[in-house]
Amino acid sequence: AGNTCGAQGGPASQPSPTGQDVGAGNPLDLMSGNKYQQEVDLPALPGVLGLEIVRHYNSHRARRGERSALGSGWRLSYDTSLRIGSDRLEIIQADGARVIFARDPQRPQRCASTDPGRGEIRIKQAAGGEEYVWHWPQGRRLHFDAAGRLIQILAPSGEFVSLRRSPEGRLLQVTDPQGRSLHLHYHGAGSPFPGIAHIDSPLGRFSYAQAAMAHSGPGPAGRHVAKAQHATVNLTEVTYPAADARAT
């Protein structure tokens, strides 16, 4: 489950196909029990596909123990990814929503969803291997590399956002059509959490603090011990350029 409140979508996420609000409170999906939360650190800057820093929290993602560069359950709006399978492709949106595209043996270069409103994924050969392009009905295109990592967002009018990554796949830089960039900096190798420490934007630096919460489990003679190696890392504080620290 993704956004529970009739999502408006984002640069790399489609809105809810129904637009139905099933949320309550902060908000909680009454049907699935999933808690979804959106936080806007930097609203989209002016212009087509203007830079933004928007975080999405999804409790299903946190419960599954998915690793995140921000902290358990959180993703940036540019963190939509593609999971590649032998019989299907699966889009995992930044808000946690998932869209399945079945492979068609008769048309191996195209994969379709059961919902035509989700568009289709086309597969093409590129220098680094296969490249996957998610075509939205409205004309937007999302380009993923051979590992399923988002590398470009193309507007119908031709402007595009480029995403630069490390060899390991870490997002390092996001550049919008106006030439403005976000630069992502990560905690050092000696840190217990190798995730995002700062994001430098045209309006200043945003800093992110995380804290580990160790899980307990059965130890010798039935005693419970903390399992630091399985600790959940939670996002605890965000500091804005004006030194305004906000707890999440």
Which residues fall in each region the model found?
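Short secondary-structure "cap/edge" segments that initiate or terminate local elements
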Residues: 1-116, 228, 243-248
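Extended charged/polar low-complexity repeat regions
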Residues: 53, 72, 83, 87-248
